[in-house]
Amino acid sequence: TIDSFCLYVIRNHFHEIDLEPNFRIGDEGELKLLKEDVLAKVLLKNYEESAPEFLAFVDGYASGRNDAALSGMILQLYEFSRSYPWPKKWLPAAAESYGIEDEASLESAAFMQSLLQNLKRVSEDLVALSGRAYKLTQDDDGPDMYAKALEGDLKKYKEIAASESFADFYQNYRNLSYDRLASSRGFDGNEEKLELVKKLREMGKDAVKKINRQYFFTSPEIMAEQMKKTAPMAAELVRLTLEFDEAFTAEKRRKNLVDFHDLEHFALNIFVDEETGKVKKTAEEFRDNFKEIMIDEYQDSNEVQETILRAISREERGEYNLFMVGDVKQSIYRF
């Protein structure tokens, strides 16, 4: 497993990351209690300091005298951040993404560019899906009575795929409507093709519903307003998460404990320089040990694991010896 590999790397190169050689992996219960204890101390310290930003955060998310919701948010963000190669860089960047002033700054935000790429891709998939259905209506034994409606679908999907902004995608997806299919009474062609065309069309409709739920639950204008209002809370959540991370790391070091996320991050630090992103000598040495690297259940890999395995692959030499097998539909990281 990736964990056993990381453990092997650390056992043999612990001195490169200033780690005591007699470390041990904490059990789940022990680490859970330690997290709770450390987080309680972090929150107590912040209650005592009573900074306005912290008190506003508490007022916004705590329930009466119960701050369990706050603790849950901090721990959830902490765990999520550990799936990224450099959590202490990722967390502040995540908070900065809320620095939205208006709809224009929302459109130009870095995360929005990635989102637009996803929307463009799924829209092009809809074009391909609809095109396949329309093509079936053109077959000699195909359901030609559906051709007009399918041609309309195809035209609309192409218009959506040509959208250049989030606002355009929002308007085009939210306003999308479909013509009714003509009656198939008296059809004497291929029944399988008729059913397939209807199935493909429904698949497209279902995909559009999912896209609207996932991306267009509110207008870009309201989204920008909400992000602007949420920015101070996001910044405070990130600050508390980083403070917890530092305290928890220090306590684990004091007890000479590591968890499974630590194994991955320690191995990553042995292989890759955080500041430059360049592969270290140790990783280059490991490259010569593997003719091929094969990853099964790739959909369950996180970015830390992928960075580790790419570091010991020979891609930089132009030798592509890294192979993955997986099913994205089963991914446990489909957040």
Place the predicted regions along the sequence by residue.
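Conserved ATP-driven helicase/translocase motor core recognized via long
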Residues: 37, 68-258
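Alpha-helical transmembrane helix bundles of large polytopic membrane transport and channel proteins
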Residues: 51, 56-67
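Preference for short coil/turn "hinge" residues that link or interrupt alpha-helices
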Residues: 3, 12, 16-18, 174, ...
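Conserved NTP-handling cores and scaffolds of large molecular machines
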Residues: 13-17, 39-50, 65, 78-85, ...
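Conserved P-loop NTPase-based nucleic-acid remodeling module centered on helicase motor cores
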Residues: 2-56, 107-114
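Conserved helicase NTPase motor core
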Residues: 7, 23-36, 69, 204, ...
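Alpha-helix boundary/capping residues
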Residues: 9-13, 38, 164, 173, ...
